[in-house]
Amino acid sequence: MDSEKILNAVKEARTLAKPRNFTQSVDLIVNLKELDLSRPENRLKEQIVLPSGRGKDVAIAVIAKGDLAAQAEEMGLTVIRQEELEELGKNKKTAKKIANAHGFFIAQADMMPLVGKSLGPVLGPRGKMPQPVPGNANLAPLVARFQKTVSINTRDKALFQVYIGHESMSDDELAANAEAILNVVSRKYEKGLYHVKSAFTKLTMGAAAPIEK
């Protein structure tokens, strides 16, 4: 899709949203066509680094012990230690709250079997299974990448809606993020953007603005 048409849709989305007393998110909505999504190879399951970033921090939880847990605490991340992990396995309601409150999870590699048992049933369906790292890992680069990353997982639905920033970002920044996501879709399929039936940009409380093809 043409960069200028994406930019025009971002601008139009702003005009379709009334001012609110909070900062509204901006999403990209994409409808797909002529894809057999019962075939796993046709499904979109991607983590995409946004060129303009997310515009605001995303909550990250680290499941760890020892030095890695201490490092995560120093970085101001949510830390889930082994004993807490075991308790979450017994309390699905609390586990769901934690899953919904965090965009990404990181886990110490040797704790992954326990993670799968305790949190797997909650994180798996949300596409939030943790990124495993060794106990001596430097978390900073991974956290920095996650702070610019969004996830797409269509499963069996021919539609996805994904965050591209918020209204305090510039039109150019938002359009660049939308274009990066559409480029991933284009590279995924042999026929590229032919499989995009329609695409829109939208603020939280506004109507959807179509991206002209």
Curated annotation (Swiss-Prot):
- What SUPFAM superfamilies does the database record attribute to this sequence? Ribosomal protein L1
Q: Which domain of life is it from?
A: Archaea
* Any one Gene Ontology BP term: translation
Cross-referenced Gene3D superfamilies: 3.30.190.20, 3.40.50.790
Role played: Binds directly to 23S rRNA. Probably involved in E site tRNA release. Protein L1 is also a translational repressor protein, it controls the translation of its operon by binding to its mRNA.
Query: Oligomeric state and partners?
Result: Part of the 50S ribosomal subunit.
- What name does UniProt use for this protein? Large ribosomal subunit protein uL1
In which organism is this protein found?
A: Methanococcus maripaludis (strain C5 / ATCC BAA-1333)
Per the record, the gene is rpl1
